[in-house]
């Protein structure tokens, strides 16, 4: 990652509130600083923008918002550009031993490829990986023959990417307000095959049981990326936020 791009580590295990950002990388230019965050994972967790919309997977964008604030303090007067949010697997990948050395290396790189979401601004892409051609072995992105980003790229236009971060702030604030107001009822969600009870430490004592009348899951809708972003825009507009993220 360091050899193929311009980002360099600027912080490890940075604590804020009760959270901890595993790694912050930055790329500094004369008038701006690009920043991305990486969270190390031992499992196969992947970023799900639908889960973010519903307030279930907010860690990475919350971390990036915090990292942007940190870099604003470090670089007063410079524009801080959020570049990406990533999960990185730290466990050793298992690949077929009978493969050639080149095939083994490709398999390892594929298994260790970052997962997440990228600010698709061309300046960001160029700083992440020089001379990107075809599918990247490092980031969830690739280029078509005409130079455009491929449809499979996990990248959003800059304004859309920043909308995701603005929505995250708004969602975080609304969840905090709900908790402060005492909303603690057991109302687990169901989305696809997952539920809020799957890994809940309190499932045996909360009193929620589908066999009891009145107990049912809150069914959350799955969205495409485009649908999730549109829903985020709508929420921001309903709450009085314009395209610049300022409340009216």
Where are these regions (language model features)?
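Structural signature of nuclease core domains in nucleic-acid processing machines
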Residues: 1-248
